[in-house]
Amino acid sequence: MAIYGIGTDIVQVSRVAAVMTRTNGRFAEKVLGPDELRVYHARHARSAARGLAFLATRFSAKEAFSKAIGLGMHWPMTWRALQTLNKPSGEPMVVASGELAEWLDARGITARVTISDERDYAVSFVIAETAQAGAADIAE
């Protein structure tokens, strides 16, 4: 495997909270995929702070992923096309859908993600990998 790209992002949880207040909670529906949204609602029901931390980590992971694949938040990279879910072991994993999944498959790109949060910040780091030769050329 060759490294296709790396991305990192840090977000201040209070900024996410402010956006949630400003949008009456619609920000979560705009950013989270369907599986993420179910987890968010379950966590938020138990603890508003844990729900907010979950939203902040997923937002951060999407930003880091978009940097790792070199697209930023431009088609086919959309908020809801990429979800960060957890394996049974708890390890986070990225799951792409739709046109983003097709774009990644065409380039042989897979990714690893790590996320962490504290009271004030959430941070994510993504390594995008490819088995294809000439990885640097296919990003263009």
From Swiss-Prot:
- Is Cell membrane a UniProt keyword of this protein? no
Where in or outside the cell it occurs: the entry states:
Cytoplasm
The UniProt GO MF terms for this protein read: holo-[acyl-carrier-protein] synthase activity; magnesium ion binding
Q: Where does Mg(2+) bind?
A: 9, 63
Enzyme Commission numbers on file: 2.7.8.7
Q: Does the keyword Flavoprotein apply?
A: no
User: Which reaction is catalysed here?
Assistant: apo-[ACP] + CoA = holo-[ACP] + adenosine 3',5'-bisphosphate + H(+)
The UniProt entry's GO CC annotations, sorted and at most eight, read: cytoplasm
InterPro entries membership = 4-PPantetheinyl_Trfase_dom, 4-PPantetheinyl_Trfase_dom_sf, ACPS, Ppantetheine-prot_Trfase_dom
Q: What class of enzyme is it?
A: transferase
UniProt-listed Pfam families? ACPS (PF01648)
Biological processes, Gene Ontology terms: fatty acid biosynthetic process
Required co-factor(s) are: Mg(2+)
Q: Which UniProt keywords apply?
A: Cytoplasm, Fatty acid biosynthesis, Fatty acid metabolism, Lipid biosynthesis, Lipid metabolism, Magnesium, Metal-binding, Transferase
Physiological role: Transfers the 4'-phosphopantetheine moiety from coenzyme A to a Ser of acyl-carrier-protein.
Q: Give the family this protein belongs to, as stated in its UniProt record.
A: Belongs to the P-Pant transferase superfamily. AcpS family.
Protein name per its UniProtKB record: Holo-[acyl-carrier-protein] synthase
Q: What is the lineage of its organism?
A: Bacteria, Pseudomonadati, Pseudomonadota, Betaproteobacteria, Burkholderiales
List the gene name.
Answer: acpS
